[in-house]
């Protein structure tokens, strides 16, 4: 006897009038999913068609809700990895729109009618901005680290300080990336102290490179020391080896002076090592990309690696990166939104908060607070900001606002909106969304 004989037929559910407005493939998928789930957790209770349809509609609504959507970042974390890190300026998007929506010369030389290099679009601008010999772009900085090590150190040894063997988001660890690249890791020093002699004593006939990794997502305080890349580079030159700086983040131009102390500047560092890499969507404020700068001979080896085909970027990334580079070269820093948010004056942030507070139908309090840089950058630094606090259960309020795509935070048991990360062009939308809520 078929124990599922009481279940409505899939076709009957798909053809039900209440699902008529949904595309066939979507409703067919969720009808099958819901029925399979109920069969898995089978009980002898009667399964009604109405109950199944209710569950199917719930699943479909959740599915549509899961689409990528714009949100208002009121968290106070400027480079928020879970919210897409850096934001692209509308004018940069408009400049790229024609390329993205049409065929383009991404790998075609319009001068001679032959195949061209996809990197040509950004190569000259990178060399100009950072004063480096050569450059390359891959899909993120983890890919850059992998490509550099695999191209320059395969089956050889790389030396790294124990204090710099970091773990980045999603449990990706530098030692595991090194291993996956086909390179042997030699750890030197301790978690809090590493000296130049530690590197020197570890060099052997199989050593290819000394790796320095910037501690961008944590801060080491108290009794500690590390060797700067300039001194490491002097050592490798003497020994006939290579130096590589995995910068991760790093800044380029026009960054808030409160943040730049002890934070490496890319243009300076590229002169102090053989090769370095950093993320395009962190402090640089552009799209996700791994940007590699260095000696022409070394970048040439990276370009010959067959893995580059798997790690290359597409026309969207190249288009947006190209426009970001143009903004930097023209010193049009207002178009680099990450820089603008980090540099915004406290009085401007207060003005934004007051404009919203004045229009809200709910009672709020204006307070001073601190914002974070985020994105695994500058963990020991914060920026002054203004917040609005809301009365009520903080967790319930956080959930309620999240349903309206407003991402705030809880601070001192209060739900707050941080106005450093709320852009001026979002203020009216924010007011409208909050005022449409019935009760908080």
Swiss-Prot record:
Q: Which organism is it from?
A: Campylobacter jejuni subsp. doylei (strain ATCC BAA-1458 / RM4099 / 269.97)
Q: Which GO terms describe its cellular component?
A: cytoplasm
Its biological function? Answer: Converts seryl-tRNA(Sec) to selenocysteinyl-tRNA(Sec) required for selenoprotein biosynthesis.
Task: Please list the GO biological process terms of this entry.
Answer: conversion of seryl-tRNAsec to selenocys-tRNAsec; selenocysteine incorporation
* Known cofactor(s): pyridoxal 5'-phosphate
Q: In which pathway does it act?
A: Aminoacyl-tRNA biosynthesis; selenocysteinyl-tRNA(Sec) biosynthesis; selenocysteinyl-tRNA(Sec) from L-seryl-tRNA(Sec) (bacterial route): step 1/1
SUPFAM superfamilies according to UniProt: PLP-dependent transferases
Reactions it catalyzes: L-seryl-tRNA(Sec) + selenophosphate + H(+) = L-selenocysteinyl-tRNA(Sec) + phosphate
Q: Which NCBIfam families match?
A: selA
Put simply, this protein is called L-seryl-tRNA(Sec) selenium transferase
Similarity field: Belongs to the SelA family.
Q: What is its EC number?
A: 2.9.1.1
Q: Which gene encodes it?
A: selA
**The organism sits in which domain of life?**
Bacteria
Residue numbers carrying N6-(pyridoxal phosphate)lysine: 282
* Major enzyme class: transferase
Pfam families linked to this entry:
SelA
- Keywords associated with the record: Cytoplasm, Protein biosynthesis, Pyridoxal phosphate, Selenium, Transferase
Q: Where does it localize?
A: Cytoplasm
One GO MF term, please?
L-seryl-tRNA(Sec) selenium transferase activity
UniProt keyword Electron transport, yes or no: no
Keyword tRNA processing belongs to the record? no
């Amino acid at each position: 006897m078929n124990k599922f004989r009481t279940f409505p037929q899939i076709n009957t559910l798909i053809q039900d009038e209440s699902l008529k407005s949904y595309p066939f493939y979507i409703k067919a998928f969720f009808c099958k999913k819901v029925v399979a789930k109920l069969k898995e957790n089978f009980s002898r209770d009667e399964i009604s068609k109405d109950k199944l349809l209710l569950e199917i509609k719930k699943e479909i609504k959740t599915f549509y809700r899961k689409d990528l959507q714009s949100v208002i970042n009121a968290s106070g974390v400027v480079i928020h990895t879970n919210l897409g890190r850096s934001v692209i300026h509308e004018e940069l998007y408009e400049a790229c729109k024609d390329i993205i929506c049409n065929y383009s010369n991404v790998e075609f030389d319009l001068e001679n009618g032959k195949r061209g290099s996809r990197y040509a679009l950004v190569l000259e601008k990178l060399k100009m901005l950072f004063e480096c010999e050569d450059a390359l772009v891959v899909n993120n900085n983890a890919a850059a680290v992998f490509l550099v090590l695999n191209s320059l150190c395969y089956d050889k040894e790389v030396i790294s300080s124990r204090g710099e063997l970091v773990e980045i988001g999603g449990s990706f660890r530098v030692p595991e990336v090194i291993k996956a690249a086909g390179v042997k890791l030699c750890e030197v020093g301790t978690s809090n102290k590493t000296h130049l002699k530690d590197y020197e004593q570890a060099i052997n006939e199989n050593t290819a490179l000394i790796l320095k990794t910037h501690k961008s997502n944590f801060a080491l305080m108290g009794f500690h020391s590390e060797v700067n890349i300039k001194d490491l580079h002097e050592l490798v030159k003497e020994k006939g080896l290579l130096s590589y700086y995995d910068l991760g983040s790093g800044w380029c131009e026009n960054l808030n002076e409160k943040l730049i102390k002890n934070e490496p500047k890319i243009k300076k560092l590229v002169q102090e090592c053989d090769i370095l890499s950093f993320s395009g969507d962190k402090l640089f404020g552009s799209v996700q990309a791994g940007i590699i700068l260095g000696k022409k001979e070394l970048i040439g080896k990276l370009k010959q690696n067959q893995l580059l085909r798997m790690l290359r970027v597409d026309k969207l990334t190249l288009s947006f990166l190209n426009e970001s580079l143009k903004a930097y070269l023209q010193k049009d820093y207002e178009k680099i939104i990450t820089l603008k948010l980090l540099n915004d004056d406290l009085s401007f942030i207060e003005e934004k908060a007051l404009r919203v507070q004045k229009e809200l139908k709910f009672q709020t309090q204006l307070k001073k607070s601190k914002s974070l840089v985020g994105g695994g950058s500058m963990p020991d630094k914060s920026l002054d900001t203004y917040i609005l606090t809301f009365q009520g259960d903080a967790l319930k309020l956080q959930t309620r606002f999240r349903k309206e795509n407003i991402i705030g935070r809880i601070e001192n048991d209060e739900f707050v909106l941080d106005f450093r990360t709320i852009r001026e062009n979002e203020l009216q939308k924010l007011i409208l969304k909050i005022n449409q809520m019935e009760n908080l």
